[in-house]
Amino acid sequence: MSTQTHPAPLRTAIVGTGNIGTDLLLKVEASPLLTCVLFAGRRAESPGIELARGRGVATSTGGIDAVVDAADDIDLVFDATSARDAVRHWAVIKPLGLPFIDLTPANQGKFCVPALNLEDCLDEQYLSMVTCGGQAAVPMARCITQIAGHVDYLEIVSASASASVGPASRANLDEYVHTTEQATAEFCSTARTKTVLIINPADPGIVMRNSIAVSTTERIDIDALRDSVTAMEKEIHSYVPGYRIVVPPVATGDCYLLTVEVEGLGDYFPRSAGNLDIITCAAVAAAEARSGLRR
């Protein structure tokens, strides 16, 4: 009788113990391919630190310095802090050669949207996960631009529940817009893009919604477009279970519009917080691919 052995999970460190970092921790711990060996922040009273300790995960208030000290026991670093901090953290991690998956909108290197370019990202040390709105909307925008061939203008409007948008995310709004627009231009080959972020204070919180609109003088085969976005929905749903199209592509004159919704798994925040899930699930997918086991 042969005994099949399974490689040990990839040992990860998470820097940032806020909303995104804590949701990421729960998803990493749920993955058979990953484990969190260090959850590092700066505030001892952080609810994320308390949750991690309760789950038996090693924690530190030493931030990136704690990661450097434990580097020999870490295979990959996730950054869930802020754009400004991520720039400094990458400067420290880069010489160590550790893979670095950045969930902030710092945008210091290769964009990674798993549904679009995961295979191209496997050998990159640094990966930018763009933004939550970018992960949700850019793949659908690309479907439109690929079929149209040329668009004159592309706009993405993302709406998220206020309670799920933490202090670091609020401090990064300019970077969020800039990075989402850069990723849209890169993946969709369009020069005129606009990103709008709406933080909705409604209680109970709204489910994350993303609307994509394009203006083009090209005639688009609407049936072909619907087939394309349905295939893309299925691809994204494979790693973000709550992702779905709620308004299929419609045409009004030279404008084409569709809307997607992202419902979270409810791991840390209520299920309405799909803006957390879309980027943490994408980051986990990228890390799992790095383990060599997803392939």
Curated annotation (Swiss-Prot):
Domain of life: Bacteria
SUPFAM superfamilies: Glyceraldehyde-3-phosphate dehydrogenase-like, C-terminal domain (SSF55347), NAD(P)-binding Rossmann-fold domains (SSF51735)
Catalytic activity: acetaldehyde + NAD(+) + CoA = acetyl-CoA + NADH + H(+)
A Pfam short name: AcetDehyd-dimer
Full protein name: Acetaldehyde dehydrogenase 2
GO MF annotation terms: acetaldehyde dehydrogenase (acetylating) activity; NAD binding
Keyword line: Aromatic hydrocarbons catabolism, NAD, Oxidoreductase
EC number: 1.2.1.10
Alphabetized Gene3D superfamilies for the sequence: Dihydrodipicolinate Reductase, domain 2 (3.30.360.10), NAD(P)-binding Rossmann-like Domain (3.40.50.720)
Cystine pairings recorded for this chain: none
Principal EC category: oxidoreductase
Family: Belongs to the acetaldehyde dehydrogenase family.
Transmembrane segments: none
Binding site for NAD(+): 17-20, 164-172, 275
An individual GO BP term: catabolic process
Active site positions: 132
